[in-house]
């Protein structure tokens, strides 16, 4: 009888063990998320990351979901950053954290060829192991840099479900840098714990998502002007007819213009702009051959870097002088007031209420123009004073123009790596009755 009962007890033991593992797994997910994760068989075609603006700095940031159990981690949006980095010195707790050994496959993928030795702590912890990979990490605002530990952990991001925000999907071994804490102590908005790199690098967020989920190599950015509402970054093909996440805004997609997308030696995103027009007057800069740009002759501006870590557009001095002079000449002289730093051209807000000059960036083709709205051009520097939101970068800028976050806000910007081009909505979103906040359904984000 005992021999006959043995298989039964064995079956019951296995069943109870499986039930326990299922309950444990479900309870861990329910502690960190309020909605179920999709099954492993689901394959998203579009991923969504909500983005917010910081009112005090004008920079943009996102809550990413990392670790086990999942936690929200606020990080700065760094369009040209090489990878995600977060500070791990304190309060980093995760059951799935790993630090790959030096010279491992993960290190090669991250272009890390130097071993990391931790001297900060007598005991090992996230960010502090020996014989791991060293990854140079920098604060994109202060330019401070230091070595972090290459690490991998779970990352989760929203998928889409029709025109709605869908459940989260996971990358189980997402590579990032566990960076020293001093990198987050200056220049960043309050409570920000790192930076999210979207640049042209092997382990940037886009490249890891493209590779892991098999997405089309394209991401779309829409930065909100308002700290109280979200913008978003979409990873995947927004033009795919099967992706109807922004079906209610198809007229915006029909208003896109494009120009070649270039990559600098440092992996930064560049776009080709042939001229700036102010009330149809073409602004032509003095050409500086030492600047990073395309060789199209003296009448072309060349490479324009797109950034999110400069709050305002920075112009090489030769361009800034001509641009501000032409702009000022199109506004009554009595409207001009003393400049408020960091800006060099400011006006009495009441005296320019009748309108300001039209400014357009002419793309690679003269028929393709990006019209910059008044809200993107002007900044309320102080009560009653409006300033042109462009900054003189001096004579030694690396690029002739570095587009800043303020000028990018409330614009749809598509980075299409498959076609090597960047796209902008030709007319401001508001001309279509849209904002970044209502272009996408970000409920439950």
Swiss-Prot record:
<keyword id="KW-0964">Secreted</keyword>
<feature type="disulfide bond">
    <location>
        <begin position="107"/>
        <end position="133"/>
    </location>
</feature>
<protein>
    <recommendedName>
        <fullName>Gamma conglutin 2</fullName>
    </recommendedName>
</protein>
<dbReference type="InterPro" id="IPR021109">
    <property type="entry name" value="Peptidase_aspartic_dom_sf"/>
</dbReference>
<dbReference type="GO" id="GO:0004190">
    <property type="term" value="F:aspartic-type endopeptidase activity"/>
</dbReference>
<feature type="site" description="Cleavage; partial">
    <location>
        <begin position="293"/>
        <end position="294"/>
    </location>
</feature>
<dbReference type="InterPro" id="IPR033868">
    <property type="entry name" value="Xylanase_inhibitor_I-like"/>
</dbReference>
<feature type="signal peptide">
    <location>
        <begin position="1"/>
        <end position="33"/>
    </location>
</feature>
<feature type="domain" description="Peptidase A1">
    <location>
        <begin position="60"/>
        <end position="425"/>
    </location>
</feature>
<keyword id="KW-0020">Allergen</keyword>
<dbReference type="GO" id="GO:0005576">
    <property type="term" value="C:extracellular region"/>
</dbReference>
<keyword id="KW-1015">Disulfide bond</keyword>
<comment type="similarity">
    <text>Belongs to the peptidase A1 family.</text>
</comment>
<comment type="subunit">
    <text>Two-subunit monomeric unit made of alpha and beta subunits coupled by disulfide bonds (at pH 4.5 and under non-reducing conditions). Can also form oligomers including dimer, tetramer and cyclic hexamer (trimer of dimers) (at pH &gt; 5.5). Component of globulins complexes which accumulate in seeds. Interacts with flavonoids (e.g. apigenin glucosides) present in globulins complexes.</text>
</comment>
<dbReference type="InterPro" id="IPR033121">
    <property type="entry name" value="PEPTIDASE_A1"/>
</dbReference>
<feature type="glycosylation site" description="N-linked (GlcNAc...) asparagine">
    <location>
        <position position="130"/>
    </location>
</feature>
<comment type="function">
    <text>Sulfur-rich seed storage protein that remains undegraded at germination.</text>
</comment>
<dbReference type="InterPro" id="IPR032861">
    <property type="entry name" value="TAXi_N"/>
</dbReference>
<feature type="disulfide bond">
    <location>
        <begin position="118"/>
        <end position="128"/>
    </location>
</feature>
<feature type="disulfide bond">
    <location>
        <begin position="102"/>
        <end position="115"/>
    </location>
</feature>
<dbReference type="GO" id="GO:0006508">
    <property type="term" value="P:proteolysis"/>
</dbReference>
<dbReference type="InterPro" id="IPR032799">
    <property type="entry name" value="TAXi_C"/>
</dbReference>
<dbReference type="Pfam" id="PF14543">
    <property type="entry name" value="TAXi_N"/>
</dbReference>
<dbReference type="InterPro" id="IPR001461">
    <property type="entry name" value="Aspartic_peptidase_A1"/>
</dbReference>
<dbReference type="Pfam" id="PF14541">
    <property type="entry name" value="TAXi_C"/>
</dbReference>
<keyword id="KW-0325">Glycoprotein</keyword>
<feature type="disulfide bond">
    <location>
        <begin position="346"/>
        <end position="387"/>
    </location>
</feature>
<feature type="disulfide bond">
    <location>
        <begin position="88"/>
        <end position="178"/>
    </location>
</feature>
<keyword id="KW-0732">Signal</keyword>
